[in-house]
């Protein structure tokens, strides 16, 4: 399980570091940005037999994401939990391999951005319009695929080499 926690911490740090070093703004988002923490939640999901531990990790990560990056209260916790529900449903029907894990990550990133947009719109916090949302969704796909593929390959190889089992 320590490998999974390290992966989540690295992803969380990447969210902050790359936002500082990759020039981007809401009007012109970069092709090399994604939400690494969400991708990590998708990639580690299948390593948990017991979803209770996964949900604890999700709640902690959502809280930290709210506090450190978005300065919102409960927004990311709710969004991360909804993404968990989506991943859980998809995992029941779609096996895990490099192609399907990328599909799940893309769907999770799309869900994150769309839910953020909808929730912020509901509370009249309009920071961008729907066409900008489309650009953000389109441009986040490339890095989502790259990071998911790298993460999945490394975790699969490392985790099964060391533990040869799932997290209990």
Which residues make up each language-model segment?
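Terminal, non-globular segments
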Residues: 1-168
């Amino acid at each position: 399980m320590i490998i999974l926690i390290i992966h989540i911490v690295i992803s969380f740090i990447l969210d902050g570091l790359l936002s500082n070093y990759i020039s981007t703004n809401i009007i012109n988002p970069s092709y090399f940005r994604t939400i690494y923490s969400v991708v990590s939640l998708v990639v580690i999901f299948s390593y948990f037999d017991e979803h209770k531990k996964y949900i604890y990790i999700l709640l902690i990560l959502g809280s930290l994401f709210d506090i450190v990056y978005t300065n919102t209260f409960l927004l990311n916790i709710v969004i991360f939990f909804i993404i968990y529900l989506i991943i859980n449903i998809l995992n029941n029907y779609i096996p895990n391999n490099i192609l399907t894990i990328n599909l799940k990550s893309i769907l999770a990133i799309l869900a994150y951005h769309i839910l953020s947009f909808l929730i912020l719109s509901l509370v009249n916090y309009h920071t961008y319009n729907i066409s900008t949302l489309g650009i953000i969704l389109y441009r986040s796909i490339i890095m989502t695929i790259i990071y998911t593929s790298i993460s999945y390959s490394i975790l699969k190889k490392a985790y099964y080499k060391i533990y040869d089992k799932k997290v209990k």
